[in-house]
Amino acid sequence: MPWIQLKLNTTGANAEELSDALMEAGAVSITFQDTHDTPVFEPLPGETRLWGDTDVIGLFDAETDMKDVVAILEQHPLLGAGFTHKIEQLEDKDWEREWMDNFHPMRFGERLWICPSWRDIPDENAVNVMLDPGLAFGTGTHPTTSLCLQWLDGLDLNGKTVIDFGCGSGILAIAALKLGAAKAIGIDIDPQAIQASRDNAERNGVSDRLELYLPKDQPEAMKADVVVANILAGPLRELAPLISVLPVEGGLLGLSGILASQAESVCDAYAELFTLDPVVEKEEWCRITGRKK
């Protein structure tokens, strides 16, 4: 069915309040969009970080009288009479199909493919991870996930134990298992991530070799041959004492979620205990790898 879209421009600080106003005026969904395509850096715990200049977009049923909507919004103290906005009629499309059409199998390194469930597997002889795009957790499309997958693909993981610190969807742990690891351990602070990882592991037939823990439940003295953490630079620095003890002596460490401009400070946090490799960059992001001394 067709829809009507109303777009407001505001500051990040006011975006949530205007989102509520749009919903009260009859919007069926809300989208926040960066006005200037600038990156959002890591939020503080409990904080919803938005851009300084944010578009708030409300989607309305095609039968909605937008004059009434505008009249309601004009009563809001952040808007007032004659507030700037843009109303656009959206053409009737199969939005779910269009969304699905945007996702294709992706290759990482020499052996590894990440494939949505509705696509044909390009190479039956390759290492194929079946993973559908989701709203919250990694699916391989972000440069940091790509950097980690390429790194794992280049390792000999046969018989190894791998820890995925901040596992999200479980994509890195599952890829490691598919690439030959004997066991993987996923750790995440979000119970929804633990469930997503469990579901994806079952879908890929590796759930019997994947252990999943919230930090409070993880075993003491846990060790692995390979540790990968695709989180953010701030947590990587703060958690360096914890992450650094996870690899065995001579074990490998892979870190991402790091902007290139943050690489030096993250390297400094790990240099004492690891022999670090040259930093690898992709777009504005980078990967740091090393071996435990």
Curated annotation (Swiss-Prot):
It catalyses: L-lysyl-[protein] + 3 S-adenosyl-L-methionine = N(6),N(6),N(6)-trimethyl-L-lysyl-[protein] + 3 S-adenosyl-L-homocysteine + 3 H(+). S-adenosyl-L-methionine binds at residues 145, 166, 188, 230. Keywords: Cytoplasm, Methyltransferase, S-adenosyl-L-methionine, Transferase. One of its GO terms (molecular function) is protein-lysine N-methyltransferase activity. One of its GO terms (cellular component) is cytosol. It is an enzyme of class 2 (transferase). Its EC number is 2.1.1.-. InterPro entries: Ribosomal_L11_MeTrfase_PrmA, Ribosomal_PrmA_MeTrfase, SAM-dependent_MTases_sf. Gene3D superfamilies: Vaccinia Virus protein VP39. One of its GO terms (biological process) is methylation. It is found in: Cytoplasm. Its main location: cytoplasm. Transmembrane segments: none annotated. The keyword Cell inner membrane does not apply. Methylates ribosomal protein L11. Belongs to the methyltransferase superfamily. PrmA family. This is Ribosomal protein L11 methyltransferase.
